[in-house]
């Protein structure tokens, strides 16, 4: 496990200068756990928050042994200590967040607007990687532009188990929904192509949970009607431990039955089998 030293004087001064350009105050949420690294995460954020009155650090402590995280917003978090090369994209992300803007191309923003289900993007990085800051900066902006992208930046020198889990051989590596991988210095167009061209029929059940829990049955039913497919991942929500998720999926099926009775009839055998096992 690598040990991160406190920010250098030069890094702190650079951060102070960058944070002076913030237009609106913002919060950095640091989720601390019993993990041995939690103390380092706090020591990293404290001087940054002290460097600007526009940055408020909120520390939340959990009893679990889960990894600590630095959360810039609900869909963008770091399992990393972004010093050194990674400091620039981290600070730039805070600046863009404060301005509610990005530097993404208009065509990118238009395509991101078509995302309607959550997509998990894990970015594997290391402190010595020359291309990682560029990719991290791009992915962070995509997360600022679309709440449906759930981004986690992971330093594999701190969390080697993720490198083992995904058989990472080089960085940066992007892992999309725990399956597809993109390696190297990826262009904006290529990454957006990958993110926006996925078929909902292949999505994990968790990808549909956000829609169901937000009560947007009409949206999910409309997607199924448009694709003439009752997504298997969505149907699995009928057995979710969360009662509200199960009920939400029932509402989706009711909405779907009104729009396309034939489509609902096509999954009757699955529903009967499901009820038999309950």
What are these regions (language model features)?
Residues 2-25, 81-114, 200-206:
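N-terminal leader/targeting and pre-domain segments
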């Amino acid at each position: 496990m690598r040990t991160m030293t406190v920010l250098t004087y030069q890094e702190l001064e650079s951060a102070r200068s960058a944070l002076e350009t913030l237009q609106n105050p913002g919060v950095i949420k640091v989720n601390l756990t019993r993990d041995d690294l939690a103390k380092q995460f706090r020591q990293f954020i404290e001087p940054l928050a002290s460097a600007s009155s526009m940055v408020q650090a909120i520390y939340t402590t959990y009893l679990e042994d889960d990894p600590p995280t630095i959360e810039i917003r609900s869909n963008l978090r770091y399992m990393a200590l972004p010093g050194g090369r990674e400091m620039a994209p981290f600070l730039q992300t805070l600046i863009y967040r404060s301005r509610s803007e990005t530097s993404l191309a208009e065509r990118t923003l238009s395509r991101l607007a078509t995302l309607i289900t959550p997509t998990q993007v894990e970015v594997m990085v290391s402190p010595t990687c020359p291309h990682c800051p560029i990719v991290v900066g791009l992915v962070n902006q995509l997360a600022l532009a679309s709440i449906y992208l759930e981004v986690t930046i992971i330093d594999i020198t701190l969390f080697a188990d993720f490198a083992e889990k995904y058989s990472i051989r080089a960085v940066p590596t992007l892992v999309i929904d725990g399956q597809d991988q993109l390696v190297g210095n990826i262009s904006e167009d290529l990454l957006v192509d990958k993110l926006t061209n996925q078929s909902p029929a292949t999505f994990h059940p968790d990808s549909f949970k956000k829609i169901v829990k937000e009560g947007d049955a009409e949206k999910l039913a409309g997607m199924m009607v448009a694709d003439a497919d009752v997504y298997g991942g969505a149907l699995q929500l009928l057995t979710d431990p969360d009662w509200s998720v199960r009920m939400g999926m029932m509402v989706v099926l009711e909405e779907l039955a009104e729009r396309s009775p034939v489509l609902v009839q096509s999954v009757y055998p699955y529903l009967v089998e499901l009820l038999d096992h309950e």
